[in-house]
Design a protein with these regions (language model features):
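A short SAM/SAH-binding and catalytic strip from SAM-dependent methyltransferases
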Residues: 104-118
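Acceptor-substrate binding/catalytic loop of class I
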Residues: 148-164
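Class I SAM-dependent methyltransferase SAM/SAH-binding core
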Residues: 46, 52-95
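Conserved beta-strand signature within the Rossmann-like core of class I S-adenosyl-L-methionine
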Residues: 134-141
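Core SAM-dependent methyltransferase catalytic element
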Residues: 182-202
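A short glycine-rich, Lys/Arg-flanked "PGG" loop and its adjoining helix->strand segment in the class I
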Residues: 121-133
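Conserved class I S-adenosyl-L-methionine
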Residues: 1-41, 145
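A short acidic, Gly/Pro-enriched loop at the edge of an enzyme's catalytic core
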Residues: 94-106
Length: 202
């Protein structure tokens, strides 16, 4: 699935960036949520699956020591050209470029939506590996009453019920801090969860 997602986004990276690669295209509630989360992040942070890099730039402008990563080289090249003051690199969510417990936070903003549901726990475990005790993850995704595939404009994506995603986060080593949902007219339901890494020492 990773290769299929990479290929689909490589073909449409320019189109995607033009349509969704700016903060003006983002919901005000999302900007406020991410800005509030950023105020509490104190240390190295990764924007995991950064796409065009606009959220990475947003975090950088809010004082976060952030690096954007994406497996699509076209996104990374474009982001680096648009935001030269912000670090970006090609990397995968399966193997984040961070040592154990090295990060204060990870933003995963709709970057898991194309992941087959059976593979999501492994990615959350990888996030947990990288986040230090009391560090946080902000996860955005499409919400529904059951796990269900749908025809995303780029490539197949998946809805997740909030309670099931909370359970997966808990199993990976996180405690739920906040949960947010919203339904915009004519749009798919959205959800976001802020989760704190449980102590590495038990």
């Amino acid at each position: 699935m990773t290769d299929a997602v990479r290929s689909a986004y490589r073909e449409r990276a320019g189109e995607y960036t033009e349509a969704l690669g700016s903060l003006s295209a983002m919901a005000e509630g999302d900007r406020n949520l991410i800005a509030g989360w950023a105020r509490d992040v104190d240390g190295p942070t990764i924007d995991a699956g950064c796409g065009p890099g606009h959220w990475t730039k947003f975090l950088h402008d809010h004082g976060v020591a952030v690096e954007g990563i994406d497996m699509v080289s076209e996104f990374i090249d474009g982001a680096a050209a648009r935001f030269p003051e912000v670090p970006f690199r090609v990397a995968t969510l399966e193997a984040l470029p961070a040592d154990d417990a090295a990060l204060a936070g990870i933003l995963s903003w709709y970057s898991l939506i194309h992941t087959p549901p059976a593979d999501v726990p492994a990615l959350l475990t990888e996030f947990a590996r990288c986040i230090r005790s009391e560090g946080t993850l902000l996860l955005g995704f499409f919400e529904a009453g059951q796990i269900e595939a749908f025809g995303h404009a780029v490539v197949t994506a998946y809805y997740w019920p909030v309670p099931l995603m909370q359970d997966e986060l808990a199993a990976a080593g996180f405690e739920i801090v906040e949960t947010h949902t919203r339904v915009d007219p004519g749009q798919r339901p959205h959800a976001a969860i802020i989760a704190r890494r449980r102590s590495w020492i038990r």
